[in-house]
Amino acid sequence: MRVVVNPAHDPSAVAPPSAEARAYHASLPGYAPTPLRPLPGLADELGLGAVALKDESARLGLPAFKVLGASWAVERALRERPEVHTLVAASAGNHGRAVAHVAALRGLAARILLPARSAPARRAAIAAEGAELVVVDGDYEDAVRQAAEDGARDGCLEVADVGDSGPAHWVVDGYATLFTELGEAFDVVLVPTGVGSLAAAAARYGAMAGAAVIAVEPVAAACLAASLAAGAPTRVATPGTGMAGLDCAEVSAAAWPDLRAGIAGGVTVDDAEAQAAMRELAALGLAIGDCGAAALAALRALATEDAAAPLRAAVGLGAASRVLLIATEGPTDPDAYARATGAAEPRGAA
Protein backbone atom coordinates (compact mmCIF):
# COMPACT_ATOMS: atom_id res chain seq x y z
CA MET A 1 0.00 0.00 0.00
CA ARG A 2 1.20 3.46 -0.92
CA VAL A 3 -0.52 6.76 -0.16
CA VAL A 4 -0.02 10.07 -1.95
CA VAL A 5 -1.46 13.47 -1.00
CA ASN A 6 -1.98 15.70 -4.02
CA PRO A 7 -0.09 18.98 -3.43
CA ALA A 8 -1.96 20.65 -6.32
CA HIS A 9 -5.46 19.85 -5.03
CA ASP A 10 -7.69 22.82 -5.92
CA PRO A 11 -11.37 21.93 -6.45
CA SER A 12 -12.12 25.47 -7.60
CA ALA A 13 -10.15 24.73 -10.78
CA VAL A 14 -12.20 21.66 -11.72
CA ALA A 15 -14.65 21.77 -14.64
CA PRO A 16 -18.37 21.43 -13.83
CA PRO A 17 -20.01 18.06 -14.56
CA SER A 18 -22.04 17.63 -17.73
CA ALA A 19 -25.81 17.48 -17.30
CA GLU A 20 -26.59 16.59 -20.92
CA ALA A 21 -25.56 12.94 -20.76
CA ARG A 22 -28.02 12.05 -17.97
CA ALA A 23 -31.01 13.02 -20.13
CA TYR A 24 -29.66 10.89 -22.96
CA HIS A 25 -29.04 7.88 -20.73
CA ALA A 26 -32.53 8.18 -19.25
CA SER A 27 -33.94 7.77 -22.77
CA LEU A 28 -32.22 4.42 -23.32
CA PRO A 29 -34.25 1.20 -23.03
CA GLY A 30 -33.67 -0.45 -19.67
CA TYR A 31 -32.09 2.58 -18.02
CA ALA A 32 -32.37 2.74 -14.24
CA PRO A 33 -30.06 4.19 -11.59
CA THR A 34 -27.76 1.56 -10.14
CA PRO A 35 -28.26 0.79 -6.45
CA LEU A 36 -26.52 2.37 -3.50
CA ARG A 37 -25.73 -0.36 -0.95
CA PRO A 38 -25.34 0.73 2.69
CA LEU A 39 -22.56 -1.05 4.60
CA PRO A 40 -23.33 -0.21 8.25
CA GLY A 41 -21.20 -3.01 9.69
CA LEU A 42 -18.14 -1.72 7.89
CA ALA A 43 -18.82 1.84 9.03
CA ASP A 44 -19.07 0.68 12.65
CA GLU A 45 -15.90 -1.41 12.38
CA LEU A 46 -13.85 1.46 10.93
CA GLY A 47 -15.35 4.14 13.18
CA LEU A 48 -16.97 6.11 10.36
CA GLY A 49 -20.32 7.84 10.12
CA ALA A 50 -21.55 5.80 7.14
CA VAL A 51 -20.23 3.76 4.24
CA ALA A 52 -22.17 3.06 1.05
CA LEU A 53 -21.26 1.21 -2.13
CA LYS A 54 -22.42 2.32 -5.59
CA ASP A 55 -23.01 -1.04 -7.27
CA GLU A 56 -22.16 -0.93 -10.99
CA SER A 57 -22.31 -4.71 -11.49
CA ALA A 58 -25.44 -4.40 -13.67
CA ARG A 59 -25.59 -1.28 -15.84
CA LEU A 60 -27.77 -1.19 -18.97
CA GLY A 61 -27.35 -4.92 -19.51
CA LEU A 62 -23.59 -5.00 -18.90
CA PRO A 63 -21.54 -5.83 -15.79
CA ALA A 64 -19.70 -2.50 -15.50
CA PHE A 65 -20.15 1.28 -15.56
CA LYS A 66 -18.28 1.71 -18.86
CA VAL A 67 -21.39 1.77 -21.04
CA LEU A 68 -22.24 5.22 -19.64
CA GLY A 69 -19.17 6.72 -21.25
CA ALA A 70 -19.21 4.65 -24.42
CA SER A 71 -22.87 5.27 -25.21
CA TRP A 72 -22.62 9.02 -24.74
CA ALA A 73 -19.36 9.30 -26.70
CA VAL A 74 -20.91 7.41 -29.63
CA GLU A 75 -24.07 9.50 -29.51
CA ARG A 76 -22.09 12.75 -29.58
CA ALA A 77 -19.75 11.54 -32.31
CA LEU A 78 -22.54 10.31 -34.60
CA ARG A 79 -24.25 13.68 -34.40
CA GLU A 80 -21.16 15.07 -36.11
CA ARG A 81 -20.28 12.04 -38.26
CA PRO A 82 -23.43 10.16 -39.24
CA GLU A 83 -21.54 8.34 -42.02
CA VAL A 84 -19.59 6.21 -39.51
CA HIS A 85 -20.17 2.48 -39.96
CA THR A 86 -17.51 0.93 -37.67
CA LEU A 87 -16.59 1.71 -34.07
CA VAL A 88 -13.01 0.97 -33.00
CA ALA A 89 -11.73 0.80 -29.43
CA ALA A 90 -8.79 -0.42 -27.41
CA SER A 91 -9.67 -1.98 -24.09
CA ALA A 92 -8.58 -4.07 -21.15
CA GLY A 93 -12.07 -5.61 -21.31
CA ASN A 94 -14.99 -3.54 -20.02
CA HIS A 95 -14.70 -0.50 -22.31
CA GLY A 96 -14.39 -2.70 -25.38
CA ARG A 97 -17.42 -4.72 -24.42
CA ALA A 98 -19.38 -1.51 -23.87
CA VAL A 99 -18.38 -0.14 -27.29
CA ALA A 100 -19.28 -3.45 -28.95
CA HIS A 101 -22.63 -3.46 -27.16
CA VAL A 102 -23.42 0.10 -28.25
CA ALA A 103 -22.39 -0.72 -31.82
CA ALA A 104 -24.81 -3.64 -31.91
CA LEU A 105 -27.63 -1.49 -30.55
CA ARG A 106 -27.02 1.12 -33.24
CA GLY A 107 -26.54 -1.29 -36.13
CA LEU A 108 -22.83 -0.58 -36.50
CA ALA A 109 -19.80 -2.84 -36.80
CA ALA A 110 -17.20 -2.90 -34.02
CA ARG A 111 -13.49 -3.70 -33.97
CA ILE A 112 -12.08 -4.14 -30.46
CA LEU A 113 -8.36 -4.41 -29.73
CA LEU A 114 -7.19 -6.13 -26.55
CA PRO A 115 -3.73 -6.62 -25.04
CA ALA A 116 -2.12 -10.05 -25.14
CA ARG A 117 -2.65 -10.63 -21.40
CA SER A 118 -6.42 -10.05 -21.55
CA ALA A 119 -8.45 -12.87 -20.00
CA PRO A 120 -10.19 -15.39 -22.29
CA ALA A 121 -13.52 -14.73 -20.55
CA ARG A 122 -13.31 -11.03 -21.36
CA ARG A 123 -12.44 -11.78 -24.97
CA ALA A 124 -15.40 -14.14 -25.25
CA ALA A 125 -17.78 -11.56 -23.79
CA ILE A 126 -16.73 -9.00 -26.39
CA ALA A 127 -17.02 -11.50 -29.24
CA ALA A 128 -20.51 -12.40 -28.01
CA GLU A 129 -21.55 -8.80 -28.69
CA GLY A 130 -20.79 -9.40 -32.38
CA ALA A 131 -17.53 -7.45 -32.52
CA GLU A 132 -14.41 -8.27 -34.48
CA LEU A 133 -11.82 -9.09 -31.83
CA VAL A 134 -8.13 -8.32 -32.35
CA VAL A 135 -5.57 -9.44 -29.76
CA VAL A 136 -2.52 -7.19 -29.99
CA ASP A 137 0.94 -8.61 -29.33
CA GLY A 138 1.69 -6.16 -26.55
CA ASP A 139 0.17 -4.32 -23.60
CA TYR A 140 -2.82 -2.00 -23.28
CA GLU A 141 -0.87 0.99 -24.57
CA ASP A 142 0.08 -1.00 -27.69
CA ALA A 143 -3.61 -1.72 -28.23
CA VAL A 144 -4.37 1.99 -27.87
CA ARG A 145 -1.83 2.87 -30.56
CA GLN A 146 -3.22 0.26 -32.95
CA ALA A 147 -6.80 1.43 -32.32
CA ALA A 148 -5.82 4.99 -33.22
CA GLU A 149 -4.48 3.77 -36.57
CA ASP A 150 -7.52 1.61 -37.30
CA GLY A 151 -9.93 4.34 -36.22
CA ALA A 152 -8.46 6.75 -38.78
CA ARG A 153 -9.75 4.66 -41.70
CA ASP A 154 -12.69 5.91 -43.77
CA GLY A 155 -16.02 5.24 -42.10
CA CYS A 156 -14.40 4.30 -38.80
CA LEU A 157 -14.57 6.06 -35.45
CA GLU A 158 -12.18 5.43 -32.59
CA VAL A 159 -14.18 5.51 -29.35
CA ALA A 160 -11.24 6.16 -27.06
CA ASP A 161 -11.45 6.55 -23.30
CA VAL A 162 -7.84 7.74 -23.23
CA GLY A 163 -6.08 10.58 -25.02
CA ASP A 164 -7.32 14.02 -26.02
CA SER A 165 -9.87 13.24 -28.74
CA GLY A 166 -13.49 14.32 -28.73
CA PRO A 167 -14.69 10.85 -27.68
CA ALA A 168 -12.17 10.76 -24.80
CA HIS A 169 -13.69 13.97 -23.43
CA TRP A 170 -17.25 12.77 -24.04
CA VAL A 171 -16.53 9.55 -22.14
CA VAL A 172 -15.75 11.65 -19.05
CA ASP A 173 -18.97 13.60 -19.60
CA GLY A 174 -20.94 10.36 -19.88
CA TYR A 175 -19.67 9.07 -16.56
CA ALA A 176 -21.26 12.07 -14.84
CA THR A 177 -24.56 10.17 -14.88
CA LEU A 178 -23.25 7.78 -12.22
CA PHE A 179 -22.82 10.66 -9.79
CA THR A 180 -26.00 12.55 -10.67
CA GLU A 181 -27.88 9.42 -9.55
CA LEU A 182 -26.68 9.79 -5.96
CA GLY A 183 -29.55 10.79 -3.74
CA GLU A 184 -27.46 11.67 -0.70
CA ALA A 185 -24.32 13.58 0.19
CA PHE A 186 -20.89 12.10 0.92
CA ASP A 187 -17.73 13.53 2.43
CA VAL A 188 -15.20 11.14 0.88
CA VAL A 189 -15.39 9.18 -2.39
CA LEU A 190 -13.02 6.33 -3.29
CA VAL A 191 -12.92 5.59 -7.02
CA PRO A 192 -10.97 2.83 -8.80
CA THR A 193 -8.71 4.49 -11.37
CA GLY A 194 -7.10 3.28 -14.58
CA VAL A 195 -6.55 5.98 -17.22
CA GLY A 196 -8.59 8.32 -15.01
CA SER A 197 -11.75 9.07 -16.99
CA LEU A 198 -14.10 7.92 -14.22
CA ALA A 199 -11.89 9.58 -11.60
CA ALA A 200 -12.14 12.85 -13.54
CA ALA A 201 -15.93 12.59 -13.49
CA ALA A 202 -15.72 11.87 -9.76
CA ALA A 203 -13.49 14.92 -9.30
CA ARG A 204 -16.10 17.08 -11.01
CA TYR A 205 -18.78 15.69 -8.72
CA GLY A 206 -16.58 16.17 -5.68
CA ALA A 207 -15.80 19.78 -6.54
CA MET A 208 -19.49 20.53 -6.96
CA ALA A 209 -20.67 18.59 -3.89
CA GLY A 210 -17.82 19.39 -1.51
CA ALA A 211 -16.58 15.80 -1.31
CA ALA A 212 -12.93 14.72 -1.20
CA VAL A 213 -12.16 12.26 -4.00
CA ILE A 214 -9.47 9.61 -3.56
CA ALA A 215 -8.13 7.61 -6.50
CA VAL A 216 -7.54 3.88 -6.00
CA GLU A 217 -4.93 2.16 -8.18
CA PRO A 218 -3.07 -1.15 -8.31
CA VAL A 219 0.42 -1.05 -6.84
CA ALA A 220 1.55 -2.49 -10.19
CA ALA A 221 -0.04 0.27 -12.32
CA ALA A 222 -0.16 3.46 -10.26
CA CYS A 223 0.18 5.96 -13.10
CA LEU A 224 -2.00 8.62 -11.46
CA ALA A 225 -0.16 8.44 -8.13
CA ALA A 226 3.11 8.91 -10.01
CA SER A 227 1.64 11.78 -12.00
CA LEU A 228 0.26 13.58 -8.94
CA ALA A 229 3.60 13.23 -7.18
CA ALA A 230 5.45 14.56 -10.25
CA GLY A 231 2.92 17.28 -11.06
CA ALA A 232 2.71 16.08 -14.67
CA PRO A 233 1.49 12.98 -16.54
CA THR A 234 4.01 10.24 -15.87
CA ARG A 235 4.21 6.87 -17.58
CA VAL A 236 4.89 3.85 -15.37
CA ALA A 237 5.86 0.25 -16.03
CA THR A 238 2.96 -2.22 -15.74
CA PRO A 239 4.13 -5.76 -14.96
CA GLY A 240 0.54 -6.98 -14.69
CA THR A 241 -2.28 -7.14 -12.14
CA GLY A 242 -5.48 -9.06 -11.59
CA MET A 243 -7.26 -5.70 -11.63
CA ALA A 244 -7.24 -5.79 -15.43
CA GLY A 245 -9.40 -2.71 -15.92
CA LEU A 246 -6.90 -0.65 -13.91
CA ASP A 247 -3.80 -2.03 -15.63
CA CYS A 248 -2.83 1.26 -17.30
CA ALA A 249 0.57 2.89 -17.75
CA GLU A 250 -0.52 6.51 -18.23
CA VAL A 251 -3.44 8.80 -17.51
CA SER A 252 -5.74 10.17 -20.19
CA ALA A 253 -4.92 13.67 -21.43
CA ALA A 254 -8.64 14.45 -21.45
CA ALA A 255 -8.87 13.58 -17.76
CA TRP A 256 -5.59 15.02 -16.47
CA PRO A 257 -6.60 18.67 -15.78
CA ASP A 258 -9.50 17.59 -13.55
CA LEU A 259 -7.43 14.84 -11.95
CA ARG A 260 -4.62 17.22 -11.06
CA ALA A 261 -6.97 19.79 -9.53
CA GLY A 262 -9.76 17.58 -8.24
CA ILE A 263 -8.20 14.45 -6.75
CA ALA A 264 -7.30 14.89 -3.08
CA GLY A 265 -4.90 11.97 -3.09
CA GLY A 266 -4.43 8.33 -3.93
CA VAL A 267 -4.17 4.90 -2.35
CA THR A 268 -2.63 1.89 -4.07
CA VAL A 269 -3.59 -1.71 -3.28
CA ASP A 270 -2.17 -5.04 -4.38
CA ASP A 271 -3.97 -8.02 -5.85
CA ALA A 272 -4.17 -9.86 -2.52
CA GLU A 273 -5.88 -6.88 -0.88
CA ALA A 274 -8.37 -6.57 -3.75
CA GLN A 275 -9.14 -10.28 -3.57
CA ALA A 276 -9.70 -10.10 0.19
CA ALA A 277 -12.17 -7.28 -0.44
CA MET A 278 -13.91 -9.40 -3.08
CA ARG A 279 -14.35 -12.16 -0.50
CA GLU A 280 -15.65 -9.70 2.07
CA LEU A 281 -18.24 -8.37 -0.37
CA ALA A 282 -19.19 -11.87 -1.52
CA ALA A 283 -19.93 -12.76 2.10
CA LEU A 284 -22.41 -9.87 2.08
CA GLY A 285 -24.05 -11.22 -1.09
CA LEU A 286 -22.42 -8.66 -3.38
CA ALA A 287 -20.71 -9.99 -6.52
CA ILE A 288 -18.05 -7.38 -7.27
CA GLY A 289 -14.94 -7.86 -9.42
CA ASP A 290 -11.33 -7.04 -8.57
CA CYS A 291 -11.43 -3.44 -9.79
CA GLY A 292 -14.60 -2.56 -7.92
CA ALA A 293 -13.48 -4.31 -4.74
CA ALA A 294 -10.26 -2.29 -4.80
CA ALA A 295 -12.20 0.69 -3.41
CA LEU A 296 -13.05 -1.30 -0.27
CA ALA A 297 -9.46 -2.48 0.10
CA ALA A 298 -8.29 1.12 -0.14
CA LEU A 299 -10.77 2.32 2.47
CA ARG A 300 -9.52 -0.28 4.94
CA ALA A 301 -5.95 0.86 4.38
CA LEU A 302 -6.89 4.53 4.55
CA ALA A 303 -8.82 4.14 7.80
CA THR A 304 -6.40 1.89 9.68
CA GLU A 305 -2.80 2.12 8.50
CA ASP A 306 -0.27 4.53 10.00
CA ALA A 307 1.18 5.34 6.58
CA ALA A 308 -2.20 6.70 5.52
CA ALA A 309 -2.38 9.28 8.33
CA PRO A 310 -1.41 12.26 6.12
CA LEU A 311 -4.18 11.51 3.63
CA ARG A 312 -6.70 10.80 6.42
CA ALA A 313 -5.93 14.24 7.81
CA ALA A 314 -6.06 15.89 4.39
CA VAL A 315 -9.59 14.62 3.69
CA GLY A 316 -10.81 14.85 7.29
CA LEU A 317 -11.72 11.16 7.54
CA GLY A 318 -13.25 10.54 10.95
CA ALA A 319 -16.20 9.48 13.05
CA ALA A 320 -18.70 11.68 11.23
CA SER A 321 -17.49 10.95 7.69
CA ARG A 322 -19.89 9.60 5.10
CA VAL A 323 -17.89 7.52 2.62
CA LEU A 324 -18.83 6.35 -0.87
CA LEU A 325 -17.15 3.39 -2.59
CA ILE A 326 -17.53 3.14 -6.36
CA ALA A 327 -17.77 -0.58 -7.15
CA THR A 328 -17.10 -0.30 -10.86
CA GLU A 329 -17.78 -3.85 -12.04
CA GLY A 330 -19.19 -7.26 -11.35
CA PRO A 331 -17.11 -10.42 -11.91
CA THR A 332 -16.06 -10.09 -15.57
CA ASP A 333 -13.78 -13.14 -15.33
CA PRO A 334 -15.88 -15.84 -13.60
CA ASP A 335 -13.00 -18.29 -13.19
CA ALA A 336 -10.79 -15.68 -11.53
CA TYR A 337 -13.70 -14.65 -9.32
CA ALA A 338 -14.24 -18.24 -8.22
CA ARG A 339 -10.54 -18.67 -7.43
CA ALA A 340 -10.48 -15.46 -5.40
CA THR A 341 -13.68 -16.00 -3.43
CA GLY A 342 -13.84 -19.79 -3.27
CA ALA A 343 -17.30 -19.79 -4.80
CA ALA A 344 -19.09 -19.17 -8.06
CA GLU A 345 -20.58 -15.76 -8.69
CA PRO A 346 -23.58 -15.30 -6.38
CA ARG A 347 -26.94 -15.27 -8.13
CA GLY A 348 -29.56 -12.78 -7.06
CA ALA A 349 -27.04 -10.86 -4.98
CA ALA A 350 -28.44 -8.34 -2.58
Which stretches of residues belong to each language-model region?
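PLP-dependent amino-acid enzyme catalytic core
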Residues: 1-350
